[in-house]
Structure formats: C-alpha cells, structure tokens
A protein has these predicted regions:
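Non-catalytic pre-domain segments flanking phosphatase-related domains
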Residues: 12-17, 25-72, 80-124, 424-428
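C-terminal cap/substrate-recognition subdomain and adjoining C-terminal extension
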Residues: 29-47, 51, 57-60, 65, ...
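Bacterial N-terminal signal peptides that target proteins for export
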Residues: 3-14
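Conserved phosphoryl-transfer catalytic core
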Residues: 86-179
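Active-site-adjacent helix/loop patches that line small-molecule binding or acyl-intermediate pockets
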Residues: 130, 134, 138-151, 181-205, ...
Length: 429
C-alpha cells in the first residue's frame, strides 16, 4: 500500500517538478544569454536587463529602439588590437612612408620637453623627442634604403633586415617612444600619435594588415617580453631597454554572445573606441571573430586622408574618441539620431569613465575589473555596494589575465599572479 501511495505521489509531483525545472532553466537563460564565465550577479542583471528592454519586454518601443555602447580594447577583447597592430607593423616593417614623412609622423604634436623620469635611458639620462627622433630617423632611413619591401631599391629580405643592428634599434626605440609619450603627455597628444604611423596607407590596406595582426596575435601565447636597442650603433638617445610589452590577443565569448543577443532582441549595438575606427572595424565586424558589429556602428579615432591615403594629421572635423570625447562622439552621432542616450555602457578604463556616467538614460554600466585606482576603478566600489540588487546600475566583471578570459566572479587575477583581487589596494581602506 505504501508503495502504491508513493507511486501516486510521484506521478502527481514529478510533472510539477519538471515544470519548475523548466521555469528555472528559462529564468537562468531566458533570452539566449550564455552564462559562460560571467560573475553570477552580473549575468543575472544583464539577463534581466535584456528581458526588460529587448523586444517583447515591457520597456521596448520599436519606434524608439534602445541602444548600447561598448568600448573595444580590454572590454570586448583581451588586450589591445591597435597596440598589437603597432608592434606587428614594426616586426614586419609594414610602413608606407618615405623617411621624410616618417620623421614628420613621429614628431607630430610631441613637445620637445624631456620625457618623464620613468623613461630615462639605461644610463639614467633623460630623453626627449629630438634625441630619440634622430636615432629613429637614422634607423628607418637605413631600412628604407635596404629592405626590399619598401620598394626603394633595397635588396635585403625581411629576415636579413631584421638581423641588422638598425632594425634592433628601430624596433626597441619606436616601441619605447610610444610608451614614453603615453606616460609623459596628455591623452590628446598620445592617443593620436600612434595613428600617424599609418600614413601612406589606404583604409583597405590598414584593414588587411589589421586582420593579419589579429590572427597572428590570437595564435600567440599570452606573455610579456622585453625589447632592447642596439649596443653597437652610435646614438643620441643612448641604450634603451624596456620590459612589460604584452603579446597576444583573445576574443571574449561572453561579450560576443551578449552583443548578438542584444541585437536579436532589437537593441542596437555600437562600439566607441580610442583606437582607429578602421582597425576596430576589422575585429568587430568580420564574422570569423564572432562579434558581428556593422562597420558603420563603430565610432573611433580618425586620421586625415589625402588622395585616399592617410596623412600624419588628425581629422579636424571629428572629435578624439577618448575620455570626454567619447561622450561628445555619442552625442554627435547617436543622441542626434535617436534623441536619447544609451541604456547601457560597457568599459574597462578611465578613458571610458565619462561615457559611463554622462547619460541619464543609462540603466546599466558594466565595469570590466582591471583593478584600476582612478575614477573608473571607483565605479567598481559602487557596483559592490549594490551587488545582487535587481536594479543595480553598476555591475562588475572579473577576469584572469593569465589566460585572457573572464572568470565567474567579480575579482580579477592580474597577469603573473595567482590570487584574485576585488579592488586596487589604494581603494581598500
């Protein structure tokens, strides 16, 4: 009798349990958003956000479609696509400038002041653009005349050119110069500078090179490395050696899935980047990378063009899409189009801070946790104050920099470390 009762009980209860499980599964991934390695609270907030604001949701109005804005480097991907391309150009000597144009490009808008004390040469002497510029001029001129790829009559193969002391000096000092400019001068000087090295190239040439660089970097091991200049060449700047250069890129499947889910629910997806627009368009648009962002939906830095080729001058009709310039670009291109601001913004750095806080319509701000100590890093503090709340505006996502991937937690493991951290030490009191 007891067995029969149990069987009857199971027959009644099992269907109810099955329904409950199905409802639970639906609530966990109701809109196709893959839990992946999202921090659970971050995932739940994003899923609820899409449900409420996407097509079929209570807040959705097809006459006023919502839109979101993502930063690109270190947000949608791991590491920086433009920095990877910069060093790929150096390694493969992919430049389209005469020595005269190169000399103009590396000096464009750079003050003659000494670089900060963090960027002295190996002998502890200060360096400035005049000193290192002279060394780079000499090295580039040698390579331009001797490497066959420049088409100036040289006979050296790439392998032969790379074996020269001039290439060793060129590689180390141009990479170092990028770091020294960024570490010494303001963002409006440093951000455009690297773009001027595309001078002489067409947009299509830049895109083709960016794709090659992406593919090479995606296959690379994630590591840091050191570059040192020639010890035998006579030079103005002296011997320079610097470590900490980052090798390798990684896609972030959680971000590509999120972008695709947003679009499938009628939420328009945009990217606002401080990299060159055409460089990011390659990574964000080509189907093989998985993000599928329309090219016209990428707002980025722009370099002036003459006769269809880039020249060493910023496009003075366009804003610099970094810091407050990101907000201005969104207002110019998107608020003017839609009549309202983005309902969500995604970023990782101080360069994204303004666009994360400047729009009253923004419901969600995703903070990729890089353990920053600036105003952007403080958004992570706000995220943890409202952690798990259904209406949280700021949400935090951790990652493991050793493998270039999200981790299912708000804490981040820095490269070379094993212990996860929630905030930069300076923010913890």
């Amino acid at each position: 009798m007891k067995k029969v009762t149990n069987n009857r009980y199971l027959k009644c209860v099992l269907p109810l349990l099955l329904v409950a499980l199905l409802v639970s599964a639906a609530s966990a991934a109701p809109i196709g958003l893959d839990p992946g390695k999202w921090a659970p609270a971050t995932y739940q907030r994003l899923a609820a956000f899409v449900e409420a604001n996407g097509s079929g949701g209570p807040n959705y109005d097809p006459a006023k479609p919502p839109y979101v804005v993502f930063d690109w480097d270190q947000t949608c991907i791991f590491n920086d696509t433009e920095e990877a391309l910069f060093r790929y150009k150096i390694e493969t000597l992919n430049f389209k400038m005469t020595p005269e144009v190169f000399a103009e490009a590396i000096r464009k808008d750079i003050p003659k002041d000494n670089f900060s004390d963090d960027y002295k040469n190996a002998d502890g002497k200060t360096v400035n653009i005049d000193l290192i510029g002279a060394d780079l001029d000499a090295a580039y001129t040698f390579l331009y005349k001797n490497y066959e790829g420049f088409g100036a009559g040289g006979k050296m193969t790439l392998a032969e050119a790379r074996a020269t002391e001039e290439f060793i000096d060129f590689r180390a000092k141009l990479a170092w110069l990028y770091e020294a400019i960024g570490g010494t001068f303001s963002a409006d000087v440093s951000y455009p500078w690297v773009l001027y090295l595309f001078s002489g190239m067409t947009a299509d040439e830049v895109k083709a090179l960016a794709e090659k660089s992406n593919d090479a970097a995606l296959a690379d091991k994630l590591e840091t490395y050191t570059l040192s200049s020639s010890k035998t060449l006579q030079s103005k700047a002296g011997y320079i050696s610097m470590g900490g250069y980052k090798r390798g890129l990684r896609t972030v499947p959680e971000m590509s899935n999120l972008m695709n889910v947003l679009r499938s629910h009628g939420i328009h997806v945009y990217v606002c980047t401080a990299s060159l627009d055409n460089v990011v368009r390659v990574f964000s648009n080509l189907p093989k990378y998985g993000y599928n962002v329309p090219e016209e939906n990428v707002l980025g830095m722009r370099v002036a063009m003459e006769d269809g080729k880039y020249v060493p001058r910023y496009d003075d009709t366009w804003v610099q899409t970094q810091q407050a310039g990101k907000t201005e670009a969104i207002k110019r291109e998107l608020v003017s189009k839609y009549g309202y601001g983005p309902i969500a913004v995604f970023g990782d750095s101080q360069g994204d801070y303004r666009m994360c806080v400047d729009f009253e319509e923004t419901q969600v701000v995703l903070v990729v946790n890089r353990l920053r100590k600036d105003d952007f890093g403080k958004l992570g503090l706000q995220a943890m104050e409202t952690h798990g709340k259904p209406d949280a505006k700021f949400i935090l996502q951790g990652r493991d920099e050793n493998i270039g991937a999200f981790r299912p937690d708000e804490k981040t493991i820095k490269y070379g470390k094993t212990e996860p951290e929630l905030f930069h030490a300076s923010l913890v009191k």
